[in-house]
Swiss-Prot record:
Keywords: FAD, Flavoprotein, NADP, Oxidoreductase. The lineage of its organism: Bacteria, Pseudomonadati, Chlorobiota, Chlorobiia, Chlorobiales. HAMAP family: FENR2. This is Ferredoxin--NADP reductase. SUPFAM superfamilies: FAD/NAD(P)-binding domain. One of its GO terms (molecular function) is flavin adenine dinucleotide binding. Its cofactor is FAD. Its EC number is 1.18.1.2. Binds 1 FAD per subunit. It is an enzyme of class 1 (oxidoreductase).
Length: 350
């Protein structure tokens, strides 16, 4: 499977739907386009498909996607692409969308950072939370030279932590997941959180507590990092301080900072679309305040929205389905069960 090269081959030919964002929501939207006989083009700013799953934690295991009791993030991306690629969607990688124009005939013109212009009859924004950068520890200055060697903000390869004394900063899902996930490879794992309790999922928090009780992990709550000791590009110690003022040190080879990300919608924020909490307001058909422009996944807001992968996939199916009424006005939208469509395709392929 090729997920890290441009295999766009459609030239400037107009497509029914332009999907902005190649994460799980965008990839599944491409599959749904195939199911509904809609031509589509994915435009992704990164050089690979998969969004945060591929870029930040490809080896992280995910447990809350229906039908997958446990699946590596990279494996989920592969499965989603295997579904979508049967319909040969056009894919453009390494180009970020900068602006859109709605033309007199109701179609859209999309411009990217490369200066390329793409045309579509409708647009689906599936760009997640937009551009994301990891939150860093403001009290640690001038550690850029350690990043990617001794200091990390994501786990892209577990071997980076194999046989190492790892200090993890954070108390959310990612911090808890990796505190447990790195136990099989790390020499020692220490989890540090500035609050008095974890903010992560209950089950994962219990897993951490169980690991602590059996002596497999050190946990320090109400504690913050104050400084680090280094030898060249190598981390040697992390200085910690409890809220009562007690300071102490722990030996460390790796510092893994997992305190969240800062998101930025970038040019999308200037598209004169209705926003709530840095997300685009959509109606029950996943349509934004602009006719023909839809949103799905984390970038979409509606009352009761739950920001998980499963919801994004549902959003994608809804958005693609309802985009048909804009792409082909007046045409009756018919639902075809996937089992029926696939059986028909297999029969026709013989």
């Amino acid at each position: 499977m090729t997920l890290n090269k441009v295999f766009f081959s459609g030239g400037e030919e107009i497509r029914d739907l332009c999907i902005v964002g190649g994460g799980p929501t965008g990839i599944f939207a491409a599959f749904q386009c195939g199911m509904n006989n809609i031509s589509c083009r994915i435009i992704e700013s990164m050089t690979q498909l998969g969004g945060q799953l591929a870029a930040l934690y490809p080896e992280k295991h995910i447990y809350d996607v229906a039908g997958f009791p446990e699946v590596p993030a990279a494996g989920l991306v592969e499965s989603l692409w295997k579904q979508a690629e049967r319909y040969n969607p056009d894919v453009v990688l390494g180009e970020a969308v900068t602006r859109y124009s709605k033309l007199d005939d109701g179609s859209f013109e999309i411009t990217t950072t490369s200066g390329s212009v793409y045309h579509s009859r409708a647009v689906l924004l599936a760009a997640g939370l937009g551009a994301f950068t990891p939150r860093k520890l403001p009290q640690l200055n001038a550690i850029d030279h350690l990043e990617g060697h001794s200091v990390f903000y994501a786990v892209k390869n577990m071997q980076d932590f194999a046989g190492k004394k790892v200090v993890i900063i954070g108390g959310g899902d990612s911090a808890l997941d990796w505190a447990v996930g790195l136990l099989p490879v790390a020499e020692r794992v220490t989890l540090v959180h500035r609050m008095h309790e974890f903010q992560g999922h209950g089950k994962t928090a219990r897993d951490v507590e169980e690991a602590k009780e059996r002596g497999a992990i050190d946990v320090y709550l109400n504690t913050e990092v104050t400084a680090i000791d280094t030898s060249g590009e190598n981390l040697t110690k992390v200085h910690l301080c409890k809220k009562n003022g007690t300071g102490f040190q722990v030996e460390a080879d790796r510092l893994l900072v997992l305190i969240g990300f800062k998101s930025n919608l970038g040019p999308l924020a200037d598209w004169d679309l209705e926003l709530v909490d840095n997300a685009l307001v959509v109606d029950s058909h996943m349509k934004t305040s602009v006719d023909g422009l839809y949103a799905a996944g984390d970038i979409a807001f509606y009352p009761g929205k739950l920001k998980i992968i499963q919801t994004g996939l549902s959003d994608a199916a809804m958005a693609v389905r309802h985009s048909l009424t804009y792409i082909r006005p007046g045409e009756k939208v018919k639902h075809t069960f996937s089992s029926v469509k696939m059986a028909r395709e297999k029969k026709n392929a013989k």
